[in-house]
Amino acid sequence: MAADQRPLAIAVMGPTASGKTALAIEAAQRWGGEIVSVDSALVYRGLDIGAAKPDAAMRAAVPHHLLDLRDPWQVYSAAEFAADARTAMAQIVARGKIPILAGGTGLYFRAALEGLAQMPEADPAVRLAIAAEAEQVGWGALHAQLARIDPVAAARIHATDRQRIQRALEVYRISGKPISYWQTRPAGPRAPVRVLKLVLAPRQRAVLHARIAMRLDVMLADGFLTEVEQLRALPQMRAVAAPLDLPAVRAVGYRQAWEYLDGAGSLAEFRDKAVQATRQLAKRQLTWLRGELDARWFDPERDRGQLEQAVAGFLGQRRTMQQPSAV
């Protein structure tokens, strides 16, 4: 079998608040890389403090890609991300740099590196019709409707997961086929790069929980609630009938802040809900990461030496690949 000659890339993965951004910037500066954000919140303009978006100084130090692609009242799909990420990786390689993918959105990683099964594109009119129906009968009734037309998908989708219920019904209404049918079709072509997957995750769950709480407190001190108030004040957001259904507002922390500013509970209760929601997100991320059997796991504090050795060993292949073969 011929050697894999695809350009090399690094994927910095891990649960939220594990230190992915700092490691990605450090690796990019050391090895000559550019960062491709793999985060479903960072694609939205205005989601800065609460999404821990790299600031101007970080972006000046290292080029970042796939930030601020959409306004918060818009939708951005995993298929769009896959196309944009592959374009960004190809451009980075063409400049002689190393793509460093960094983030915590598992579906985006899978879309960019493995491809997605082809399925019907989103139809705004169909989505609006489904949302209007949900206003009348409730999302529970729509989940029951999904169970009748696609029991396989309904078994995987929780009755409160509005976004996935809406997408599954949308696909069926557009194509006449259940989303589970489309998901079994062949995925797209493999990624244009060969990737070293690094997972940053503290060995002690209590350490991660402490980091989550501390980061939220820093965000609050930096003006997170003011940021959400500014989002709420945008005319386009005020025109949305159900803003809590927008992907941007469903981002962890933002939904809880939005509900708090709607008058739901005290500031202390908001903080507790946001911390708990972030812990739950981290748990889901870790569950997904355990399925990445080719990933290498490192504690961000204890395993720095081993992590650096892993990166150096992997990127050492790049020099070998670039050398001309002997005649």
Swiss-Prot record:
EC number, as in UniProt: 2.5.1.75
Cystine crosslinks: none
Cofactor entry: Mg(2+)
InterPro entries: Dimethylallyltransferase, IPT, P-loop_NTPase
Keyword Nucleotide-binding: yes
Swiss-Prot/TrEMBL catalytic activity: adenosine(37) in tRNA + dimethylallyl diphosphate = N(6)-dimethylallyladenosine(37) in tRNA + diphosphate
Name of this chain's protein: tRNA dimethylallyltransferase
Organism for this UniProt entry: Xanthomonas campestris pv. campestris (strain ATCC 33913 / DSM 3586 / NCPPB 528 / LMG 568 / P 25)
Taxonomy of the source species: Bacteria, Pseudomonadati, Pseudomonadota, Gammaproteobacteria, Lysobacterales
Gene: miaA
